[in-house]
Amino acid sequence: MQSLLRLLQDGQFHSGEELGAAIGVSRAAIWKRLQALESEFDLQIHKVRGRGYRLEMPLSLLAADLIAASCSYPVTLLQQVDSTNAEALRRLSSGATPPLLVIAEQQTAGRGRRGRRWASPFGENLYYSLLLRVSGGMRQLEGLSLVVGLALLDALREAGVNEAGLKWPNDLLVGGRKIAGILLELSGDPADVCHVVLGIGVNINMRVAPSGDAIDQPWTSLRQILGEQVDRNQFVTSLTRQLERYLDMHRLRGFASLREQWEESHLWQGCLVSLAAGSQAIKGRVLGVDDTGALRLEVEGREQVFSGGELSLRLHDDS
């Protein structure tokens, strides 16, 4: 069905005869494949007698060859998967050798931090998981998710989203709305040799939340901000290049060398916040982060430091 999708991705009308001739199948077979696209990927296809078929909106489909040409590690592009992070870990368990990159057009069980569901409609956003082998102990993991945030921030700015900023520990926001998130998952002993999946989700061309997905926080996308469809292959290429650059800096010099840069882009630097840790809510003012990426808060006149995990940060005056 991939060949049919590539013909339809321009959002223009195509007759059944034209589509069948291009793919080498009958018009009846085209009809069946169109029905399968609608049911499997929840795509809306308009059917107009005398004009043919078109997608409700154009798509920017990912192309494995274009992505692989700009990437220094193996790339797997899937049409649909439960979770790219889960798939990367399955491949590790099956004997795959990192580094490797898993990308999907759609996730059926995409997830974010703290078990939250990540809306993952077909062909609209980016679902990206990079599996790495990490040696050298905890130093190589310190601040890693924040470093990924810096790479993602540069990729967004390169795409024209200059207002994007960071929210500790793993979110990127524009105008108070979430545009991207990061989920790191470990396998093995972090004190010795382990593997880490850098999971990245970016709202690229999403215009409305997919049916059945109630997104529990304000969100935006590159398309909404820029007012036009974004080439997702170009964005993947940019993100991968930035990731390689920042990961090299982190490996050689640690997060401490990037701490000031991260703080300069932290949207809530100096703000009054509420930090939820289980049933406990801690109110304080953001001082920044330390050399390990932990959050520094001034709480009742004293500095306290908090690491990631199941912590949730919001502005103090948020309802």
Residue ranges of each PLM-predicted region?
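N-terminal lobe of the biotin/lipoate ligase/transferase fold
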Residues: M1-R157, K178, V230
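Short, ordered beta-strand-loop transition motifs
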Residues: K47-R49, K167, V289
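Long, positively charged amphipathic alpha-helical accessory segments at protein N-termini or as interdomain linkers
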Residues: M1-S26, K32-R33, G136-A164, V174-S319
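Conserved active-site carboxylates
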Residues: D171
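Short loop/edge segments at beta-strand edges and connector loops
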Residues: Q79, L166-W168
